[in-house]
């Protein structure tokens, strides 16, 4: 019988780090799900520990404070949004096709929510728009990144001859407002919200674009 493999201290440390990173990602993802329904202010280390069947001290070791947990939830939700909305759109050509894909993906994300409370971005911004601090800063940075992406593709679309004469920021603002409103209306049971938003977006971008 061969001797058992002896792990070095460095290997043991690496495994612990990997296990810790996986645990942190799992908890952060659940925190984002909970926050999508109950808000980021409703998060607690104890609540998440109970939901996931782990010790509160273990969660505290990974995150330290409620604010760190909130920030991790924001980052996890951002990654989900990128995976479902932004990244697939990058398979489309730059400009109007990609802009269309970004908005279509977001509407699908709203129509068939990945998180139980619908679009985390919409809920989080509404909750923290008047609460200065690191969490608001993280949400604002995410929003700024999203607007920058929309404006970039709007600019490219204009180079292709679409939406001439429109201010890219103003158009991005309109598109964002439409889908955000559709998310809220859809959560309130308005079945016309998504098709209404799609029709208005077609009018803004040009039905044949």
PLM segments and residue spans:
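N-terminal intrinsically disordered/low-complexity leader segments
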Residues: 1-22, 164-166
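Amphipathic alpha-helical segments used for helix-helix packing
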Residues: 98, 113-134
């Amino acid at each position: 019988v061969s001797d058992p493999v002896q792990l070095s201290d460095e290997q043991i440390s690496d495994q612990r780090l990997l296990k810790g990173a996986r645990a942190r990602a799992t908890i952060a993802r659940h925190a984002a799900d909970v926050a999508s329904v109950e808000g980021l202010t409703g998060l607690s280390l104890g609540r998440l520990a109970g939901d996931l069947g782990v010790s509160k001290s273990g969660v505290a070791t990974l995150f330290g404070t409620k604010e760190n947990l909130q920030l991790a939830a924001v980052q996890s939700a951002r990654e989900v949004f990128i995976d479902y909305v932004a990244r697939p759109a990058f398979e489309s050509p730059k400009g109007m096709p990609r802009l269309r894909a970004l908005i279509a993906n977001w509407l699908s994300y709203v129509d068939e929510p990945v998180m139980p409370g619908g679009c985390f971005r919409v809920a989080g911004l509404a909750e923290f728009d008047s609460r200065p601090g690191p969490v608001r800063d993280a949400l604002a940075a995410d929003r700024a990144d999203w607007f920058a992406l929309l404006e970039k593709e709007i600019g490219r679309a204009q180079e292709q001859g679409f939406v001439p004469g429109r201010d890219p920021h103003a158009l991005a603002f309109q598109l964002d407002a439409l889908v955000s409103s559709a998310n809220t209306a859809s959560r309130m049971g308005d079945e016309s919200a998504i098709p209404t938003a799609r029709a208005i977006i077609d009018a803004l971008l040009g039905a044949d674009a």
